[in-house]
């Protein structure tokens, strides 16, 4: 039933929606890998509904053959010779799911994509025109999709010669009608159950979508906050890097200066060591000279002492000689004084004699 042509101009009621979350490509893979996901649920239910619909279609075709008096081995194209040309089978949705889903499509703008399960497409594809008879609904249900073109051009029924006993104006038998109604009710109940299940699943998915959207917004805000923090941290790290680079350059310059100073200091130390060695040699020479001088000074002192002793002795001798000469001079002076006195007394005596003679 999922392969029927879709009626143009009719909005499909099974338009599924998928949440598109940016930068999260793994969500679809995780949902596809989850056996309890909504897709797996729809796939299982669609398989069961397709199998059940196939069985009911086979059973309905057999019942139609039996009620119309056709052979069991006749082909499917001759089973129903009505010549109806519908575009696809149409069933009215008794629950009004089309309006509800159309309102939901207007409310939800954030959904996109399309996922068309066969059960929903089978149920809510199109509606039959108002002029179509109730019997044609069941006829379209039991007919092949290729034989259904549309309700506008309905030629009169054309039956084969073997089936000429069936009149196009005649009504179906009671068994056929009851069987068709039971199949329609059964199919309607199945569709209602599937619709309720899909509705519950849709509400759950909406709640889950709301939670995912809030979680996505929270994660987006967190990512933005982390991006801002990361940018600030990167700016700070870049400034720290530039500061550290300048500090490293200064340290390298200081190391070069210290290296040059260390080389100069080593050269200066070598010169000082050479000078110290020279000074030590000079000190040793001075020590030897001092010792030599000390030894020579002792010898000269003895000589000087001897010379001074000799000089003292000579001085004493000279003093003694001087005293003796001085004594001699004094005695000679006294003698001279005595001679002078004698001479004076002689002169006086002669003068007295002269005066006495003159007188």
Curated annotation (Swiss-Prot):
Gene Ontology cellular-component annotations: centrosome; ciliary basal body; early endosome; midbody; recycling endosome
Q: Which domain of life is it from?
A: Eukaryota
Query: From which residue to which does any coiled coil extend?
Result: 185-295
Listed A to Z, the keywords are: Cell cycle, Cell division, Cell projection, Cilium biogenesis/degradation, Coiled coil, Cytoplasm, Cytoskeleton, Endosome, Phosphoprotein, Protein transport, Transport
| Ranges where the record places region Disordered | 153-180
Stored InterPro entries: ENTR1
PTM Phosphoserine: at which residues?
A: 18, 74, 167, 171
Q: Where in the cell is it found?
A: Cytoplasm; Early endosome; Endosome; Recycling endosome
Q: Determine if Cytoplasm is one of this entry's keywords.
A: yes
Q: From its record, what is one biological process in GO terms?
A: cell division
Q: How is it modified after translation?
A: Phosphorylated.
Free-text comment on this protein's domains from its UniProt entry: Tne N-terminal domain is necessary and sufficient for basal body localization and ciliogenesis.
Subunit text: Found in a complex with ENTR1, PTPN13 and GIT1. Interacts with PTPN13 (via the FERM domain). Interacts (via N-terminus) with GIT1 (via N- and C-terminus); this interaction is direct. Interacts with NOD2. Interacts (via N-terminus) with IFT88. Interacts with VPS35.
Q: What does this protein do?
A: Endosome-associated protein that plays a role in membrane receptor sorting, cytokinesis and ciliogenesis. Involved in the endosome-to-plasma membrane trafficking and recycling of SNX27-retromer-dependent cargo proteins, such as GLUT1. Involved in the regulation of cytokinesis; the function may involve PTPN13 and GIT1. Plays a role in the formation of cilia. Involved in cargo protein localization, such as PKD2, at primary cilia. Involved in the presentation of the tumor necrosis factor (TNF) receptor TNFRSF1A on the cell surface, and hence in the modulation of the TNF-induced apoptosis.
Concerning its family, UniProt says: Belongs to the ENTR1 family.
Q: What is this protein called?
A: Endosome-associated-trafficking regulator 1
The lineage, from the top, is: Eukaryota, Metazoa, Chordata, Craniata, Vertebrata
The encoding gene: ENTR1
């Amino acid at each position: 039933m999922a392969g029927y042509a879709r009626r143009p101009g009719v909005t499909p009621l099974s338009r599924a929606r998928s949440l598109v979350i940016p930068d999260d490509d793994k969500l679809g893979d995780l949902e596809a890998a989850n056996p309890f996901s909504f897709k797996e649920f729809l796939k299982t239910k669609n398989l069961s509904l397709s199998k059940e619909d196939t069985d009911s279609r086979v059973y309905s075709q057999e019942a139609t053959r039996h009620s119309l008096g056709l052979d069991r081995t006749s082909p499917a194209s001759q089973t129903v010779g009505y010549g109806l040309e519908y575009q696809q089978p149409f069933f009215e949705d008794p629950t009004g799911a089309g309006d509800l889903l159309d309102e939901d499509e207007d409310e939800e703008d954030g959904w996109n994509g399309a996922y068309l399960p066969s059960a929903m497409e089978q149920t809510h594809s199109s509606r039959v025109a108002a002029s179509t008879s109730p019997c044609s609904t069941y006829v379209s249900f039991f007919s092949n999709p290729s034989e259904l073109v549309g309700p506008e051009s309905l030629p009169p029924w054309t039956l084969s010669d073997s089936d000429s006993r069936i009149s196009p104006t005649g009504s179906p038998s009671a068994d056929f009608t009851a069987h068709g109604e039971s199949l329609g009710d059964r199919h309607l109940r199945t569709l209602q159950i599937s619709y309720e299940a899909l509705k519950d699943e849709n509400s759950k998915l909406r709640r889950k979508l709301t939670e995912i959207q809030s979680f996505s917004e929270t994660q987006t805000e967190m990512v933005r906050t982390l991006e801002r923090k990361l940018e600030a941290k990167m700016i700070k790290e870049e400034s720290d890097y530039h500061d550290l680079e300048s500090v490293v350059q200064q340290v390298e310059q200081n190391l070069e200066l210290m290296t040059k100073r260390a080389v100069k200091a080593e050269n200066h130390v070598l010169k000082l060591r050479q000078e110290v060695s020279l000074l030590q040699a000079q000190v040793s020479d001075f020590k030897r000279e001092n010792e030599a001088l000390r030894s020579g000074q002792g010898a000269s002192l003895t000589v000087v002492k001897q010379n001074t002793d000799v000089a003292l002795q000579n001085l004493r001798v000279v003093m003694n000689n001087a005293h003796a000469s001085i004594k001699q001079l004094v005695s000679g002076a006294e003698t001279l004084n005595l001679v002078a006195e004698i001479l004076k007394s002689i002169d006086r005596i002669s003068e007295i004699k002269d005066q006495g003679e003159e007188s």
